[in-house]
């Protein structure tokens, strides 16, 4: 399977590799075909290829809401996503706020929403939010105290859930 995938990854048309989505789709089709032909699950094929075993425990899957962060967060909560929502916070004015207020309100809403919609009090997703350097953009990439204070505010807004912030600043 890896051999097939490596050879497919190198196919070029007009001197360019095929688009990532095409390569991904074909690799999934190959994996699915190998699994079905050998009466195994796709995860078993991957485990065999890499000399490992299939996990007995659920693996936390990272989810991504895109710009429809409110509706998609609801879907993630109802499906029990372990890591959510990514949120695509890539614009200061529209998504973060000039003082970070838009994101802070969203994190508060997210915490309240999980507590309202979850079916099990043990459901404690990790909030993972990618901010694409926008926190550094509003506070200044050298203003570590202000960024740290804001991150602490976000952490408080997320309680009782854990919060991960991806890419707080571009340096």
Q: Where would I find each of the regions flagged by the language model?
A:
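Residue-identity detector for threonine
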Residues: 1, 20, 52-53, 63, ...
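Metal- or metallocofactor-binding catalytic centers and their adjacent structured scaffolds
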Residues: 1-40
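Generic structural signal for short, flexible, solvent-exposed coil/loop and linker residues
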Residues: 15, 50-51, 70
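Short alpha-helical segments and helix-capping/turn motifs at coil-helix boundaries
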Residues: 28-29, 42-48, 65-68
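Broad hydrophobic/π-residue packing in well-ordered secondary structure
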Residues: 31, 43-45, 135, 146-147
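Extended, Lys/Arg-enriched charged tracts that mediate electrostatic binding to polyanionic substrates
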Residues: 34-38, 42-47, 51-55
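Metal-dependent enolase-superfamily TIM-barrel catalytic cores that perform enediolate-based chemistry
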Residues: 56-171
């Amino acid at each position: 399977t890896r051999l097939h995938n490596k050879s497919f990854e190198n196919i070029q048309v007009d001197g360019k590799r095929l688009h990532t989505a095409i390569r991904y789709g074909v690799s999934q089709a190959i994996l699915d075909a190998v699994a079905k032909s050998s009466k195994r699950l796709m995860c078993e094929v991957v485990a065999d290829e890499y000399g490992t075993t299939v996990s007995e425990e659920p693996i936390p899957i990272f989810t991504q809401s895109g710009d429809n962060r409110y509706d998609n967060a609801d879907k993630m909560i109802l499906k029990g996503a372990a890591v959510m929502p990514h949120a695509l916070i890539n614009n200061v004015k529209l998504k973060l706020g000039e003082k970070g207020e838009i994101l802070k309100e969203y994190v508060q809403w997210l915490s309240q929403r999980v507590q309202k919609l979850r079916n099990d009090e043990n459901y404690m997703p990790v909030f993972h939010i990618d901010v694409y350097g926008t926190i550094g953009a509003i506070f200044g990439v050298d203003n570590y105290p202000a960024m740290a204070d804001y991150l602490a505010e976000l952490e408080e807004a997320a309680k009782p859930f854990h919060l991960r912030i991806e890419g707080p600043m571009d340096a």
